[in-house]
């Protein structure tokens, strides 16, 4: 590896660290769309819902295109059945956001109950 390339790689890493440390804002966050896969998987298990087909081998949501995304979204949100579920989801999303450096969030939700 050349010295120039090494410097470029190090500069990019430094830039990423700098940017990741900046405070962030979410100006249009859909609560259900931001649901962590692990949260939805756990909630579905509590409710005895089998939505395992929406996750890939690493536990992430699995979809190929927008239409697939809509099917996954529908299955994932089927686990959100009560105000308490939304309370727990809100906490999970805000914790994840805070860990990413989000200091302000305008969050929208669309409960279906």
Give the label of every model feature segment.
Residues 2-113:
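Metal-cofactor-binding active-site regions of metalloenzymes
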């Amino acid at each position: 590896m050349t010295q120039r390339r090494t410097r470029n790689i190090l500069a990019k890493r430094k830039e990423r660290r700098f940017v990741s440390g900046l405070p962030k804002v979410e100006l249009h966050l859909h609560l259900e769309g931001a649901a962590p896969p692990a949260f939805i998987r756990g909630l579905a298990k509590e409710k005895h819902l089998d939505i395992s087909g929406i996750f890939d081998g690493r536990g992430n949501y699995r979809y190929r295109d927008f239409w697939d995304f809509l099917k996954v979204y529908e299955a994932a949100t089927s686990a959100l059945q009560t105000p308490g579920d939304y309370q727990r989801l809100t906490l999970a999303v805000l914790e994840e956001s805070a860990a990413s450096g989000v200091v302000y969030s305008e969050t929208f939700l669309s409960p279906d109950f």
